[in-house]
Amino acid sequence: MRILIIEDEQHLAEALGQIMAEQKYQVDLVYDGAEGLDYGLSCQYDAILLDVMLPKLNGFEVARRLREARVSSPILMLTARDEIGDKISG
């Protein structure tokens, strides 16, 4: 399985990547929304872990653009935000 992690906190991204690599997943790590969008559009991923608060493009915008481009990979949103509006948007 190939997983894309889009997370701007490098230590968290690397920890998630290490855990998944130990489980034999192939992992790509990127640290901003624009680069994450490029990766998501250029490769077929089995899942995308996507932070909401990202530099350049936020996670909601990345998810919207991926869906507009008909990328069908499951997207799992990561966030510490707990507002109802954020949950609805995600």
Which functions belong to the PLM regions below?
Residues 1-90:
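N-terminal/domain-start alpha-helical segments
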